Structures are given as C-alpha cells and as structure tokens.
Amino acid sequence: MPTTAATEVSPDNLEQYRRELTGYCYRMLGSGFEADDAVQETMLRAWRAADGFEGRSSVRSWLYRIATNICLDMLRGRQRRALPIDLGPASPPVEALLGDWSPDDIWISPISDAKIVPEHGDPAEIAVARDTIRLAFVTALQHLPARQRATLIMCEVLKMPAAEAADTLGTSVAAVNSALQRARATLAALPEEQRPASVDADQSELLAKYVDAFQRYDMDQLITLLHDDALMTMPPYSFWVRGAGDIVRWMQEPSPSACRNSIMVPVGQVNGSPAWAQYKPDPAGGHQPWALQVNEVSAGRISRMTFFLETERIFPAFGLPPHLG
C-alpha cells in the first residue's frame, strides 16, 4: 500500500519538474542530448521508487538527489566538454588550418530555451534561468569538478540554502560552503574569453541587420555589426577565430563560401540567445543544412558567434526541416 507521501510521486506531479531538472542536468553535463537522457532516467527511477518515498524531504529535493547521482555517474572518468576557445589559441582565417572534426562527445551542445526557461513566473527567475544556460556560462562550469559543479548550480543558480544542498549531495553544510568557495575561485581565475560576459537585453534591431547582411553576403555591412574582439567558433572543429576582421576574412575565404546565398531560418532562443538555422545552397537544388548559429550581443555589437555544424543530429532535435526547396 503506497504511503501518503508516495502518492505525491505520480507521473503528473513529477512532470512539473521536468524543465528545471533539464536545466540542472544540462548545466551539469553540457549536452542537450545527455540532459534529456538524464532527466528521463530520473523520472523513471523516481516512479519505480515511489512506494519507498517517505516524505522526509520534498519531492523536488528527492528528484534533485536522484538527478545528481545520475549526472555524477555519467561524468565519472569522462573528458570535460568544451568549446574550441578552451582548447587552444585563435587561428588565422585560413581554410587550410581548419583540420578535422573532433568527436562530438567533447563539445558543448546547444539546447532550446523552451526546454528549460519557464514560460511564466517571476521575471528575475526567468532571467537567471536564461543567463545560466548561455554557452559561455555552461562551458565555464565544465572546468569545475563534478561535485563542485553541482554545489555551485544548486546554491548560485537554484538558490538552494546550504543545508538543502548538503542534504541533496549527502554531505555537510561546511563541505558545501567550502566547495562553493573553491568553485567561485576557479571560475574567477579563467581567462577572460572563457568567462561569462554580460549581454545586451535589447538585441532585435542589431540582429535584424545582421541577418539581412548575412543573407545578402554584404561583408562590408556585417563587419560593422561585430565587436572588434568578437569570437567565432565552429564545433566540432577545434579551429576558432578572434576579431571582426578575421571573422569576415574567414567568411570570404572558403571557395565556394558556405555563407554566400545562405538562408537564415529563425529558431527562437537557444542557450539564452537568439539563434538561426543556416541553410546553404544545395548543388542539386534548394538549400541544405549548414549550421545552427547562436550569437551573443554585448556593448551594442555581436561578441560571440557559434556555428554548430553537426546538423544531422542538431536539426532534427530542433524540429528543423532537412532541406529547403
């Protein structure tokens, strides 16, 4: 006979936690695909263990304990995920230096805001949810040991009291405070390009100009929209470029350029930033997938451009068509 507490662990009751658990697992794992798997496993384990839930903690805390254990198991013995700027210096904009694709399991992968950010609620909480899935923030988190990462997310992002975080992690309040202090110090010591930067809230006019210039292949206009020290990465390549001039030279370098005559399809918010599906001309006709573009804006210009090129995995995950006629 299920206990009164166990009746709280119904599928409908568990489902209300899916978004925030997805956000937690994504920040822990750095992969939208793995976050989905981890949350699904969390729900399954919770449902199977429902009869044993005694209500000594809230359902939410119990779910976070399960999700944390799953994430720690998934991270054990694994190389941290990264973006190209973590792995080496910027390259000159020369196609011959592009190199080969690296395995997909070393890269941060994108995720739609719709899977994590609440549709309604406190605007401040929505802003925190969005800011803490930005690519730079999620990448910075991967520099932390897994338990420090969990501690920082619980205390800084989810605003859990230290006692609740300690209970969830199965440790003491003193250990939580110590881990939090070490995690903050690690993030503060990262090189500037690897640290999260503040982003502009009102981006619409600038980004509309960017899409227009990109689709017209107007590099003279596009360079005026980029920050002088803008960064461009293209996972799964380790290659990356720094500076507006080098970015534009790169877009003009490959022959034929994948940027020329592209079509940009809005995708909505991805990792807290506006994103587009870029389709390049298909020699057989129409346009074929080329990249998911995620751009960040700071100080009135585009400061980071990430082109996710693994379209065979990413486009289906975002419900994007495999071809434009």
Give the positions of each predicted feature.
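Hydrophobic alpha-helical bundles that form the membrane domains of multi-pass transporters
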Residues: 33, 51-53, 65, 88
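Charged, low-cysteine interdomain linkers and short loop/connector segments
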Residues: 85-125
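A short, charge-rich alpha-helical start-of-domain segment used by transcription regulators
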Residues: 1-23, 33-36, 47
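Sigma70-family region 2
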Residues: 31, 41-59, 73-82, 142, ...
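Short, small-hydrophobic-rich alpha-helical interface motif
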Residues: 21, 35-46, 63-67, 136, ...
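C-terminal and inter-domain tail/linker signature
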Residues: 19, 30, 44, 56, ...
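Short amphipathic helical patch at the helix-1/turn junction of helix-turn-helix
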Residues: 15, 26, 154-157
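Arg/Lys-rich amphipathic alpha helix in sigma70-family domain 2
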Residues: 68-86, 94-101, 189
